[in-house]
Amino acid sequence: MTIFLILAPYGTFTLLMVVTSATVSLFMSAAVGLAVIAFDIVRGRAIKILGAGSVILFSALGFYLTLVDPGLSNSAVKLAVDAGVLAISLTSMAIRRPFTLQYALEVVDAETAKLPDFMKANYIITGAWTGAFLLMMIASVLMIYVPGLPLWSGLVIAFAARNSAAYFTKWYPEYRRAKFGPPAGALSRS
């Protein structure tokens, strides 16, 4: 369920971009992001870097479209979202708090969280997501600058990148558990 909640604002954005305006899609995605944050707060969990950053990203782009440039193309909006989430991911690593760390700390014991390999694993998983975000951004750039590409090609790249990162997020802790034994195995239980 955690991965669903993390991706819910982005799924909302992608779905609504097909059926309504970019502005509505952005504000609804921000609302879904706020709902996820509220859900975490109610459960006594911390506000996440990715969640808060996503709400800020969707809201800022929504206000930009409303107040500054309502004619911005859907492809440019998608590129801005992809660039924004890539920036959130890179920033989280630059400040030494990879965004996956907050989620991982909620499912491991304190002893596991203190292990140096625990932080390394979170950098690796965040790096996998960063790679996926980069591929999604490249797909958006291709859709803008190579107009002959079929629409589905960008969607396939984004879908494959996101699903690969989600799979890696589940697989990597299991791999570490099998390779290094029980202490590193507590990296993820969800």
For the regions a protein language model found, what residue spans apply to each?
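C-terminal ends of transmembrane helices
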Residues: A35-R45, T169-K170
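C-terminal membrane-adjacent module
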Residues: D109-S190
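Cytoplasmic-side transmembrane-helix entry/capping segments in multi-pass membrane proteins
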Residues: I47-S59, S75-D82
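Membrane-water interface of transmembrane alpha-helices
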Residues: S89-V107, I125
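Alpha-helical transmembrane segments
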Residues: N74-S92, I157-R162
